[in-house]
């Protein structure tokens, strides 16, 4: 248990409305920064960013240099005791999620601190609603059959926010006896950098294998070199969780890479080319001419997708989540 600090809260917030001792202690540490004239958004965004970079750089060497520069740039704005306070806040986040993994800790705290109104007018779906959505989404028999046939299944939230829906889905898998750490690949995307980092932190600390893509889902949706999402197109905007670096997932990534390398290159065959026909006389060509059609052309029918291109589960079954 954490002891409550004595004294008044700087910004007049009522910590009694925050659940759990870890949450209350984190809010108190957070608001100490505000007494130094910093805005809530600046402190929150800096803490989330340096925490996400610390987690990422521990396992992801491909983006280490760039993100380390960003970390040092932010750290230069704070004193050493303040950076230590950031570390303590991250430790409180770890404790809170260990104590109760069935929550959207950062999303709820984000809304409690009023940051949703200050930044883009965002509003996160409450976690208990996400629980209901996940319970309806997870088709136990079909889902487990796909895992049995393919070894694992990928789930994607194209507008992840702080990751509440994916967290709820992971907890729903656990309740139904599905080991999400080895059987589910979590793919998240959000246009908001800080919100995406909140999702990344929660996914990482809860041991969810996958990655978060920062970008506009409509303009630049997350795409992958392979069909199952193991090899995302990475333009520096992909954040891989530490669990994705475990042997079981590294083996799957390696096999996906080998499959791409060993795929045969399709060559045009002469037999498939259209055969030339003997030249026809002008009289014969006139007979072949079609009469002019005065009717308006009808709209072309939409071609049906080949069976192999159909998704494993339709988006209608998964709602906001999609499976592949």
For each feature predicted by the language model, list its residue ranges.
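Detector for methionine-enriched segments
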Residues: 1, 11, 83, 89, ...
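Intrinsically disordered, low-structural-confidence terminal and linker regions
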Residues: 1-18, 298-324
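Class I S-adenosyl-L-methionine
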Residues: 6-159, 163-177, 321-324
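Residue-identity detector for glutamine
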Residues: 23, 42, 61, 70, ...
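Generic preference for hydrophobic/aromatic residues in regular secondary structure cores
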Residues: 28-31, 184, 238-239
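Sequence-level detector for tyrosine residue identity
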Residues: 71, 78, 110-112, 127, ...
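Conserved S-adenosyl-L-methionine
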Residues: 129-234
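S-adenosylmethionine
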Residues: 202-319
